[in-house]
Amino acid sequence: ISTTSFFPAKPLGCYGDGGAVFTDNDEWASIINSLKVHGKGSFKYDNVRIGMNSRLDTLQAAILQVKFRAFIDYELTDINKAAVEYTERLKGIVKTPIIPDGFYSSWAQYTIKLKDKEQRDELQTYLKEQGIPAMVYYPNPMHLQTAYKDLGYQKGDFPITEKLCNCVLSLPMHPYITTAEIEKVIDTIAKYLKG
């Protein structure tokens, strides 16, 4: 089973909210289809489980159909070229994402790893002062979020996750980013860190 989000900021986003679930298991597909339509059973007005209204509306589906063509035709290639530019120019300055040979990414974010939270936060502030947006998307690890409190996890149970939440920063990234924009981001990071 796999999922994807069609949130507008995602690489393949619609103009509203949306997502998809993929499976090659017929039983799971049946349950997922039921859950997305209020928990519907085999009879339209018999809800056999608690579900939700999460069908993708036809307008969003039409938008995605057009965007999917652009995504396949050039956006995926362009965003991977941008990632290569970032990675090559940031070598030796910060830790960059690693994509194994034979794979590629759709790059929802290009996230760098810094020394610690203090350095990350200071760099983010400096980039903002220079007119460069940089984001911390996941400041709190999942195991420490309120929704999972009943699982009994404590701070320190997942030290790598906790460290990453404190030291990663996402840089501007989209298929239409220019080499000049990437160079400005990299030069600004290098200037700050080599300060």
Spans of model-derived segments:
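Conserved active-site segment immediately N-terminal to the catalytic lysine
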Residues: 1-13, 43-46
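Short, glycine/charged-enriched secondary-structure capping and boundary segments
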Residues: 17-19, 185-186
